[in-house]
Amino acid sequence: MSRSIKKGPFVKESLLNKIVEMNKAGDKKVVKTWSRSSTIFPEMIGHTIAVHDGRKHVPVYISEDMVGHKLGEFVLTRTFRGHGNTEKTTSVK
């Protein structure tokens, strides 16, 4: 179910304020955030945002195609390490 139109898209205010200030100053620093649920706004295009995956911050470069999506969609939280080994071991009974 999508978010109500009357509420509008969610973005953490402090994150948006940092991006707006960087746009005014012309800076391109990496911004750390734990807010995976924030929606990507057009003001964020061209910036790198380090999104927390539960263990570390993963840098995500924001491009035009990402606008409208959530930050957490681009950082995986689970790593697949493979199924069990296929080696046959001989056991002495």
Curated annotation (Swiss-Prot):
Fetch the Pfam families from UniProt: Ribosomal_S19
Gene Ontology process terms (BP)? ribosomal small subunit assembly; translation
Any one GO CC term of the record: cytoplasm
Single GO term (MF): structural constituent of ribosome
Which keywords has UniProt assigned to this entry? Ribonucleoprotein, Ribosomal protein, RNA-binding, rRNA-binding
Source species, domain of life: Bacteria
rRNA-binding as UniProt keyword? yes
Q: Does the keyword rRNA-binding apply?
A: yes
Q: What does this protein do?
A: Protein S19 forms a complex with S13 that binds strongly to the 16S ribosomal RNA.
Query: Matching NCBIfam families, A to Z?
Result: rpsS_bact (TIGR01050)
Query: Family, per the entry?
Result: Belongs to the universal ribosomal protein uS19 family.
Question: What protein name applies here?
Answer: Small ribosomal subunit protein uS19
Q: Which organism is it from?
A: Clostridium acetobutylicum (strain ATCC 824 / DSM 792 / JCM 1419 / IAM 19013 / LMG 5710 / NBRC 13948 / NRRL B-527 / VKM B-1787 / 2291 / W)
Q: Which gene encodes it?
A: rpsS
